[in-house]
From Swiss-Prot:
Its main location: cytoplasm. It comes from the Eukaryota. Acts as one of several non-catalytic accessory components of the cytoplasmic dynein 1 complex that are thought to be involved in linking dynein to cargos and to adapter proteins that regulate dynein function. Cytoplasmic dynein 1 acts as a motor for the intracellular retrograde motility of vesicles and organelles along microtubules. May play a role in binding dynein to membranous organelles or chromosomes. The keyword Cytoplasm applies. This is Cytoplasmic dynein 1 light intermediate chain 2. GO terms for molecular function: ATP binding; dynein heavy chain binding; identical protein binding.
């Protein structure tokens, strides 16, 4: 047996220390290379797992449907500015697991069809696979819902056809969309974080991998991209029930037609309300789930009539038929516009508000109107002269003949103690009439023949004045004669 030192020398050889040093360097280089490889692998993995950019959301809807307000609310802004033509904003998307951020482009088309040509600036043939479409329907006006959805769906179909996408690429998009629709699986109850879509199956029989065939009227209008139907202003359901006498039958009829439309396009359906902030968070989560593949664990919601949520791939004709069980006055196949009728336009008649005019202003206007009235030649003679009793007397009835004379044979009335008061009031009346006549006489006459007319006026006015004065004198003398006659009769 060789000594230990000899064994070491034999193992190391004549240049033993140098060979050992070279071996140590080789191991260090291998460790360094493995470290760099792990770093590069981690970087490449992060690059692959980074949130993709360039995702688009295309929003359609009528003017006043609340589409801009809805997307602004999802953006987190309090107030949005209404634009024209084609509006743009973005949604901030944050992945907490990867600590990554990105922006999702949002394009909102104007409700006027005149601006549909602007779609070419929002979505192209290259960006179509990265696009999610949202059709907005106004539930405060349910009679416009189906017509609006059909209109905007045809606009989108027309725009896709104009892109002239190669048939092979378009068929690939359609096949992928059908697969996503068929692969829908309801999330397990109480399982948080489980994906809504079924991932690669690691176990199970081959029967689980077989996709079920599409039913009737399902994906008959395949656009190749995910579609979402959002009903806004669902808080107006209570208003429809009060003002338009809507019942559960009306709401179920509307929902059944909406779900049939969604089946044709493979779309999801969600009822929202910005006013009550209902289903807004659910809408945002579903959008990022369909766009970026985030986990989504909310099942379908069909209990609340104003907070419905139907994910794409969950619905079918049998589930929709459950709504038909409550129909009593309508049939499922009836036309939408025959049962959901547009109410007649009520013209609001507002009573005109009359502002009370100031009293002094009113009197000044009346004074100016009276001053502008021209005086006519017969105006003075036609003015009524009122007697002590207040009854009007015309010129023809005036004069001494109008006063009945007392005859000796007639019975004389007893003197009235109020005669003196009547005489005083008669004086006031006389001064009033004289002031009126003096005003009338002050109006200027026309030149030329005005001399004759003014003379006639003055003579007529003097006659009236004399008649009035004589009448007043006679009335004042009447009490004295009555007293004298009564005293004479008593003496006799």
């Amino acid at each position: 047996m060789a000594p230990v030192g000899v064994e070491k020398k034999l193992l190391l050889g004549p240049n033993g220390p140098a060979v050992a040093a070279a071996g140590d360097l080789t191991s260090e280089e291998e460790e360094g290379q493995s470290l760099w490889s792990s770093i590069l692998s981690e970087v490449s993995t992060r690059a692959r797992s980074k949130l993709p950019s360039g995702k688009n959301i295309l929003v359609f809807g009528e003017d006043g449907s609340g589409k801009t307000t809805l997307m602004t609310k999802l953006q987190g802004a309090e107030h949005g500015k209404k634009g024209r033509g084609l509006e743009y904003l973005y949604l901030s998307v944050h992945d907490e697991d990867r600590d990554d951020h990105t922006r999702c482009n949002v394009w909102i088309l104007d409700g006027d069809l005149y601006h549909k040509g602007l779609l070419k600036f929002a979505v192209s043939a290259e960006s179509l696979p990265e696009t999610l479409v949202i059709f907005v329907a106004d539930m405060s006006r349910p009679w416009t819902v189906m017509e609006s959805l059909q209109k905007w769906a045809s606009v989108l179909r027309e725009h896709i056809d104009k892109m002239k996408i190669p048939p092979e690429k378009m068929r690939e998009l359609e096949r992928k969309f059908v697969k996503d629709f068929q692969d829908y699986m309801e999330p397990e109850e109480g399982c948080q974080g489980s994906p809504q879509r079924r991932g690669p199956l690691t176990s199970g029989s081959d029967e689980e991998n077989v996709a079920l065939p599409l039913g009737d009227n399902v994906l008959t209008h395949n656009l190749g991209i995910p579609v979402l139907v959002v009903c806004t202003k669902c808080d107006a359901v209570s208003v429809l029930e009060k003002e338009h006498d809507y019942r559960d039958e009306h709401l179920d009829f509307i929902q059944s037609h909406l779900r049939r439309f969604c089946l044709q396009y493979g779309a999801a359906l969600i009822y929202t309300s910005v006013k009550e902030e209902k289903n807004l968070d659910l809408l945002y989560k579903y959008i990022v789930h369909k766009t970026y593949g985030f986990h989504f664990t909310t099942p379908a919601l069909v209990v609340e009539k104003d907070a419905v949520f139907i994910p794409a791939g969950w619905d079918n004709e049998k589930k929709i038929a459950i709504l038909h069980e409550n129909f009593t006055t309508v049939k499922p196949e009836d036309a939408y516009e025959d049962f959901i009728v547009k109410p007649p336009v009520r013209k609001l008649v507002h009573d005109k508000e009359l502002a009370a005019e100031d009293e002094q202003v009113f009197l000044m206007k009346q004074q100016s109107l009276l001053a502008k009235q021209p005086a006519t030649p017969t105006r003075a003679s036609e003015s009524p002269a009122r007697g002590p009793s207040g009854s009007p007397r015309t010129q023809g009835r005036g004069g001494p003949a109008s006063v009945p004379s007392s005859s000796p044979g007639t019975s004389v009335k007893k003197p009235d103690p109020n005669i003196k008061n009547n005489a005083a009031s008669e004086g006031v009346l006389a001064s009033f009439f004289n002031s009126l006549l003096s005003k009338k006489t002050g109006s200027p006459g026309s030149p030329g023949a005005g001399g004759v007319q003014s003379t006639a006026k003055k003579s007529g006015q003097k006659t009236v004045l004399s008649n009035v004065q004589e009448e007043l004198d006679r009335m004042t003398r009447k009490p004295d004669s009555m007293v004298t006659n009564s005293s004479t009769e008593n003496e006799a």
